[in-house]
A protein has these predicted regions:
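Extracytoplasmic "Venus flytrap"/periplasmic binding protein-like
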Residues: 86-154, 160, 184-195, 290, ...
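A structural signal for short loop-to-beta-strand junctions that line the ligand-binding cleft
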Residues: 113, 119-120, 150-184, 213-217, ...
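Conserved N-terminal structural module of periplasmic/extracytoplasmic solute-binding proteins
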Residues: 7, 21-130, 316, 375, ...
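Extracytoplasmic/periplasmic solute-binding protein
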Residues: 168-171, 177, 201-251
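Extracytoplasmic/periplasmic substrate-binding proteins
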Residues: 66-70, 83, 88, 264-355
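Glycine-centered hinge/linker elements that transmit conformational signals in sensory
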Residues: 206, 247-279
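Hinge/lid segment of periplasmic solute-binding proteins
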Residues: 126-178, 192, 201, 207, ...
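C-terminal capping/gating helix-and-loop segments adjacent to ligand/active sites or protein-protein/ligand interfaces
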Residues: 162, 342, 379-393, 400-456
Length: 457
């Protein structure tokens, strides 16, 4: 009983430890109407039923879906909404009520739901900082892994959603950390894509001299900076990356020279002016807007934002010229250019307390049918699925999509989970709240490493 109580408390505190992929603070309704002052959206269908026994007998079934994708008109939110609409059309006794909040609001509400009872289907992340404590607290329902043998999941993609040999969720994406850049801006100014990290820092000065922001960075949320640090560490430490992080998190000792080196390099990067003024307090949407309106030459984020190439809210001259490159090689580092920071991040799970659990699992399984999330995601250019998408490639994809696929295909190794998601929720909270201070010089490198180490004890 004592362990159970402690686990529940941990689950409540882990709300601040979730990795984010959503960028919009604005919610769209299913009809596409803007609702800027609202933080949630509800989708219903007047014709309701389900696919379980009660539904097939005509009994109405209502599913509640809690999502971190508030933009229902573009990207992953559009894909999610499309599948919901199709499910309700095919199962006219089922109503799916969607609550879709932006990242920070989602974290806060998840904490409340941990106390009050979770909605039936929820967005989750397959990383220890999130999954371990939630599963220990009994929040998520176990899934039957054998059910997904024919779903085309990429080898190893279910590992992060597995705990003590049991499956508790399904991954949506294969995520790659990339620099998006404005190809036309680069060409017009004679700038070259950097091949080394020193090249990148030198380019920052050149771009700044032109009156343009080199890289738009979401430094306010913490996790993108932690991913950036992980990206640097992988390029520097190479195959030792996972062991270095594991040793540090398990002992609380972050004095490894590799960690010291890349943290110093992060500070040097900020000092060189690679990021915009005020990056350490600006959020996802602000950083993305700097790039999509042409104020910044680059934007550091995950491959889930490849839908920018088809987003008509972005000026055509910009969206048709968005390209990507991965972290350049670091001087003295062990990794080569094709060793990239990539992992399986966000996905979905079913609440252990759901009163319509059978229907919730059936809806989850419907979402992951190979011709649903994977196919629609590819068609809408929302990055790479955790499932095989080769059957859906037509040759008509955007140049940005093709480039991301080529990067993954040419990769020689993948980093795995970013450092901020490799420990407890306390560690995640610590590193994501302290990383701004070390990058801007408020905190020394030694103090930063000591502070995050203390959070592991």
């Amino acid at each position: 009983m004592k362990r159970k109580i402690v686990s529940v408390i941990l689950a409540l505190t882990m709300v601040f430890s979730m990795v984010g992929c959503g960028n919009s603070s604005e919610t769209k309704t299913s009809s596409g109407t803007d609702t800027e002052t609202s933080s949630e959206t509800e989708t219903t269908n007047d014709e309701t039923s389900g696919t379980d026994e009660s539904a097939s007998s005509g009994e109405e079934v209502t599913l509640r879906l809690f999502s971190n994708l508030p933009d229902r008109k573009n990207g992953q939110g559009l894909v999610e909404q499309t599948i919901i609409d199709e499910y309700m059309a095919e199962n006219p006794n089922v109503t799916i009520e969607v609550e879709a909040l932006d990242e920070e609001a989602y974290k806060t509400k998840f904490k409340a739901y941990s106390m009050e009872g979770m909605p039936d289907v929820v967005s989750i992340w397959g990383q220890p900082a999130f999954l371990d404590e939630v599963v220990d607290a009994g929040v998520l329902a176990e899934l039957n892994q054998d059910d997904y043998s024919e779903y085309g999941f990429v080898e190893g993609s279910l590992n992060g959603f597995t705990y003590d040999g049991k499956l508790y969720g399904l991954p949506r994406n294969t995520d790659i950390a990339v620099f998006y850049y404005n190809q036309k801006m680069f060409t017009d100014n004679g700038w070259e894509v950097p091949q080394t990290y020193n090249d990148l820092l030198a380019l920052a000065g050149t771009i700044k001299d032109a009156g343009i922001i080199p890289v738009a960075m979401d430094g306010g949320d913490g996790w993108p900076m932690a991913v950036y640090l992980s990206d640097l560490l992988y390029k520097y430490a190479g195959s030792d990356y996972s062991q270095i992080i594991s040793n540090a998190v398990s002992t609380g000792d972050f004095s490894a020279p590799e960690l010291q080196k890349v943290t110093e390099l992060l500070k040097e990067t900020a000092d060189a002016g690679l990021f915009q003024n005020g990056y350490d307090s600006q959020d996802y949407g602000t950083a993305m807007n700097l790039f999509t309106n042409g104020q910044a030459a680059m934007f550091y984020m995950g491959s889930w934002e490849t839908s920018m190439a088809t987003n008509e809210d972005i000026p055509e001259e910009i969206r048709t010229n968005i390209r990507v490159f991965t972290m350049p090689v670091v001087e003295g580092g062990k990794a080569q250019a094709t060793d990239i920071a990539a992992w399986n991040g966000g996905g979905y799970a079913v609440s252990a307390s759901s009163e319509v659990k059978e229907e919730a699992v059936k809806f989850l399984n419907y979402m992951y049918q190979p011709d649903k999330l994977s196919k629609y995601g590819w068609e809408n250019g929302v990055g790479l699925s955790a499932q095989d998408q080769s059957a859906y490639m037509t040759g008509e994809e955007t140049d940005l999509q093709k480039q991301v696929v080529d990067i993954l295909s040419a990769s020689t190794s993948l980093s795995g989970t970013p450092i901020n998601d490799c420990g407890s929720s306390a560690f995640k909270t610590s590193i994501e709240s302290e990383i701004q201070n070390v990058s801007n010089g408020t905190t020394s490198v030694d103090d930063f490493l000591s502070t995050i180490g203390a959070s592991c004890n």
